[in-house]
Every structure is written in structure tokens, then in C-alpha cells.
Amino acid sequence: MGKQQETILIIGAGISGLATSRLLTNNGIPNIVFEASTPDRSQGFAISLQEFGYSTLLAALGDLPLSSLIRAVAPDRQIGGTGWIDQALRDNRTGELLVAPDLTTTKQTIVRANRNALRHWIADCGEDELDVRYGHKLQSIKGKLGDVTAIFENGAKYKGSLIIAADGVNSTSRSQILPDVVPETIPLIHYHGEFQLSHSAFDELIRPHSGHSNILVGVGDSFNTPLSICNITKTRVHLDWSYSRTVKGENDILYRPNVQSEEAKQIPPALLEELDALNLAEPWKTILNSESLKTHRVFHWTTRCVYITQDDARRAGEQGVIFVGDSWHAMPIFGGEGGNHALLDGVELADAIAASTASSGNGDWDSVIKNYYGGAWKRSQEAVRRSTQRFFLLHRPATEWKEISEQKKKPA
């Protein structure tokens, strides 16, 4: 029982939970990861890893080379790609290049990563296998720091010294401990679609516009239409698209922030009518239309942000819960930094726990919480505000995009 008391319980097997678990395991610190979903649940869309995120993780994993990460997670890894993106913005009604960095002097600092592949790679970066228990949906939390119990809907109960809440923007852990902290809904329409093309169709339709970039970003008049490669196999190219725009008044029929999960998978007729009326350039025109969407998996996404005060973090810590990832700093996906800060959370929290364990032989949990939040709170909460501001800037009117493009063309 004593050994079980010392175990750290991690709720959620996303990238923040797995990164924390992997680093704790590599340091010989017992932990268990609990995941509500089944092992075959896909998180196959891609995210952008920035240098500040992946370099910190690689160092914590024993100074692994960047090439080991790229070979494992880049969406185009099977054809020798590096997850490169051109960071360009194009007018999705003309195809005109609006904004692009000077690629002759810019080294690759952003790595596009397939989320599923990233999770598997993190889990495999060590000699000892991670203890991940699937089918465990958290029901409640009882106890205090140093002696806390997680109770699951399947009837299982586990005691531990600390619960690490890595269960996302709609965190059950957070709602149990901090019920007054409610995610803030961003007033934006956001639909996400997944589809596949043969290599030949991809080379004909998208490659002439994207080149070797893993993202083709189209911006319009207060709306965006990015196309992203999720994964390339020997025969198929798996892609996704997003359509996002600002809300048009109080009665916008497509603004459904409280839509239920099953209804979120249904395509509203108003969306099809709206896409058909956009007058898009290729390749968006061929992909984003009412006929093409019949073969796509389409989801309504509600964009939410989470802010937690330092006092919130302290109160949760007293009850034995500490946060990583979207559970305490959810931010917009497009233009956001969430995945990178999730990795930093895992590294910094594991470091704090390992340092405390090394000095005392057992965790000084009050010091762990103080040391972790001492740096992570300001870093992550500033990132939420920064990402939210950037998200709205990426949905600016077409006239502003044109002005920016003209300014970029002027000689320095």
C-alpha cells in the first residue's frame, strides 16, 4: 500500500500526459496514465511543433537528435519529407501569395507532426514501457496532496501522491477541483474536414500550389481555409481542411458553441451553401464545395480557451491536482502554441518532481507545485492571450491582407 501511495496518477494520454509519464518513467518515478478512450482512438491530425517546444523535449529525453523526431512524426516521412512548412499565406480567392518568409535565409524551425505518430514516439522514447490504462474515464477525485484518490466510472479506484490533470480543455479533473473555471468560448465559426486523395490526384490538384510544404494556408475576407497533410502512405495522402470565420451578428446560423457531439458530426445545409458561394481559387474550390464534402468526415469545432489564476493553481494543488496541457492553458488550434506548451509542461513538471525526489527520497509536493508553477504559469497564460490575439488577426478583412502584402513588397 505504501508503494501505491507514492504512485503519481496521470489523467489523459495526450501529448502532455505521455510526455510527463515518459520523463517520470525514465527517472524511475512510478506513475500510471489513465485514458478514457480506447487504444485505437485516432488523433491523426497534424500540429506544428516549434523549436522552443521540441528542442526542450529532445534535451530532456537524453539529447536526442532532431532527425529522430522528424523520421518518426513528420506527415511526409514515408516519402523522405521533414515536416516542412513554407509559413506562407495565400489569397484563397486568387491564389496570390500574400505573405511568405525569405526561404533562402530561413532554416527549418517548425516541424509539422502527425499527432498520433507523436504520441507513439513519446511513449517509445525509453527502455521501460509506460503503464497506460485505457477505458478509464474519471468520475471524481478525493483526498489531498500526498494522499489522493482517483475514482473512475468503471468502478476502479487508485490512490496516489499526486494527480496530474492532462485531460484537455474539457478537463474532468479541473471541473472536479475548480468548478468555477469554465472554458471561454471564442466567437468564431470553425469546421474541420478529413479526406483522402490518391498520390496522382494530390500531385495534380495540390502539389502545384503547396510545393513541398505540409500546409497550404488560404486566407480570405475574414475567413480562412488551410489545407494540411496529416499523413502520406505508399498509396494515399490523408489530408484535412478547416473553414473558420468570424461570427456574423447575433443570429448566425452556423455559430453553435453548445452543439452536442453527435450533432457536431452532421453537415448543416447552411455550411454547404456558404462554401459554394465563396468563389474560391484552386485547389480550395475543388475541395471545399457541397459535392466534395459528401465524401469527407466533417466536424464542428468549438474554439475555447482556458485561463487559470495562480490562486486557482494553488487551491488545486492543495487538493492533490496539478495541471499540464490544455486542461489549464487551452488556446486556439490555428495559430496557437498549445502543443508546444504541453510538451514544456511535461518537461518542467517531470524535472520538478525528479529534483524533489532526488533531494528527499520522496516527493516534497508543496515544493514541486511551487517550482513548477513558478515558471509555467506565466509562460502558458501569456501564450493563451498571445495565441488568441493572433487567431483573430488571422481572420482580418481582405483589405488589410492586401495592405500587408503591398507593404511586404516595398523595398526596405
UniProtKB/Swiss-Prot annotation:
Glycosylation sites: 92, 170, 231
Keyword Lipoprotein: no
Cofactor(s) in the UniProt record: FAD
Record-listed E.C. numbers: 1.-.-.-
Residues the record lists as binding FAD: 35, 46, 119, 326, 339
Domain of life: Eukaryota
Position of the signal peptide: 1-21
Record keywords, A-Z: FAD, Flavoprotein, Glycoprotein, Monooxygenase, Oxidoreductase, Signal
Pfam families tied to this protein: FAD_binding_3
UniProt KW Transferase keyword: no
GO molecular function: FAD binding; monooxygenase activity
This protein's pathway: Secondary metabolite biosynthesis
Top EC group: oxidoreductase
Known role: FAD-dependent monooxygenase; part of the gene cluster that mediates the biosynthesis of neosartoricin B, a prenylated anthracenone that probably exhibits T-cell antiproliferative activity, suggestive of a physiological role as an immunosuppressive agent. The non-reducing polyketide synthase nscA probably synthesizes and cyclizes the decaketide backbone. The hydrolase nscB then mediates the product release through hydrolysis followed by spontaneous decarboxylation. The prenyltransferase nscD catalyzes the addition of the dimethylallyl group to the aromatic C5.
Family classification: Belongs to the paxM FAD-dependent monooxygenase family.
Protein name: FAD-dependent monooxygenase nscC
Organism of this sequence: Trichophyton tonsurans (strain CBS 112818)
